[in-house]
């Protein structure tokens, strides 16, 4: 589950970075500011994808983070605690760096030319966002698929 959701979420995040880089020709977050009011659709999709990456309940990243944490808690509690701290620090980093530096504050004149997402960018990202939402709310289909494969693998290895 972790690899599946990670692929969906990071695919979306990399595409979002590509969109802003194509327009601004920089990846320096400190160069931006106030973009939420200028490119609101991009801001919204970035927030959903970022929160999915954090493991926010209701998004696909939650279940993969939950199962990894739950599995490690019973086996190696110290690593589970370190992982929990990692989640907290990641949340703080994303909220501070990306949201505050890039989207909040006063818009900079330098970026007045930036336009919001085009229809094809939206069409490209919506399947990824829909997958994040669907498997965040109802993960059973993907879990059943992985469970069947893992049971088969386990039986083969135990023979």
Predicted regions located by residue number:
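Cytoplasmic/organellar membrane-interface segments at the starts of transmembrane helices
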Residues: 39-41, 95-159
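Functional transmembrane alpha-helices
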Residues: 1-114, 135
């Amino acid at each position: 589950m972790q690899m599946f959701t990670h692929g969906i979420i990071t695919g979306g995040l990399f595409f979002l970075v590509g969109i802003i880089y194509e327009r601004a020709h920089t990846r320096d977050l400190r160069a931006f500011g106030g973009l939420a009011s200028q490119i609101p659709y991009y801001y919204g999709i970035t927030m959903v994808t970022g929160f999915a990456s954090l493991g926010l309940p209701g998004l696909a990243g939650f279940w993969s983070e939950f199962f990894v944490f739950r599995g490690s808690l019973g086996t190696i509690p110290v690593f589970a605690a370190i992982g929990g701290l990692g989640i907290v620090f990641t949340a703080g980093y994303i909220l501070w760096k990306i949201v505050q530096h890039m989207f909040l504050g006063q818009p900079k004149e330098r970026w007045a030319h930036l336009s919001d997402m085009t229809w094809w960018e939206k069409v490209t990202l919506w399947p990824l966002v829909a997958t994040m939402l669907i498997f965040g709310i109802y993960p059973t289909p993907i879990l059943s698929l992985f469970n069947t494969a893992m049971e088969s693998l386990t039986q083969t290895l135990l023979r």
